[in-house]
């Protein structure tokens, strides 16, 4: 697989950040292309070594939760599938308003959106996690967001390799 094909296949693993796929490719990926765990570890290593400014840019590229219901156009296909799979497109009006309010508070406080790997969770679990993290300090949330982005990437890599 050449670099362009790798970027096409894996460029959306980290939200709106195809540069990560390019840098992962440059580390040499031929031996790990069929091993989801090894490929994920390589992506995670490159992401965590990228430095705080680039990490923050990746976090800021993530959509706010429940935006699938709001029909936001900047939502990637992967994010739309994930949010829809968690039922975030089926929020009641009250739940939707909670997400809108918490999204705004969280973003104003931290300068990046609330990020959680929604796969395998329902909207009530996501709302509870959101509520429990609202009062955390920004440094803790930055670390948690990095972990969650890596978890999202792991799910996406596995999905891509399953075909």
State what each model feature region is.
Residues 91, 95, 99-163:
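C-terminal non-catalytic interaction appendages of large macromolecular assemblies
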Residues 25-102, 152-161:
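Aromatic-anchored, charged helix-turn/loop surface patch used as a conserved interaction hotspot
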